[in-house]
Amino acid sequence: MFPIRNTVPTRYPPVITWVLIATNCIAFLFEISLSPYELEQLLYQFALVPARYSEILASDEINPVIDDVLPLFTMMFLHGGWLHLILNMWTLWLFGPTIEDRLGHSRYLAFYLTCGVVASVAHIFFNPVSIVPALGASGAIAGVLGSYMRLFPLARVVVVVPILFIPLFFEVYAFFYVGFWFLMQVLQGMLDLAVTPTRADVAWWAHIGGFVAGFALVPLIVQSERRYRAYYRDEGVLGFDPEGRM
């Protein structure tokens, strides 16, 4: 299933979502302008290398510096290729504006970055000795998906399913589409731990961590019900609950 349309209406321009997409694209254009050696140095400095943090925790003195903390944030603005970038930005473009509309610009930005950091920590926890640089906005975007399912479980998502090279279009409930996506991440993450416990080529647990963070945090920061206009209160058909109750 590939999502092509989010049916939840928005009222305000998704300025922060635009900025995030532009920042990711500019960062990727910078990446591909580098030589292979320069790119390798960039990734090992600003992407997330879990083994680096395992060494810090194993040392007698834990004295984190900015160079150790920065990758928790910067990794979510780096991507490993055009397809990686396009798929992430497409998903952010589909679902980000809805969450930004409900949280407000500043809260949405803080929420997005927090989900990304939690995703980074989850990746380190489940892949502590991996020396493969992890990068991508997937963890933060997973947080957006988690919050979307929490706030709009009955919203319809238009998806395309290719069957024998024939694209078929369906409308499915958000809880089904996002829930299925999350289940696939958990299954892949468990399989990855069983087969390659020391090497994580895909940061499945970053996706899981970001999703759980988004699902859990959004009720705490969403704007209170009394601040919503009738425009929002009429969306009960979508399963919308300002307090994030399921």
Outline where the language-model segments fall.
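A detector for small-residue-rich transmembrane helices and their helix-helix packing motifs
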Residues: M1-M246
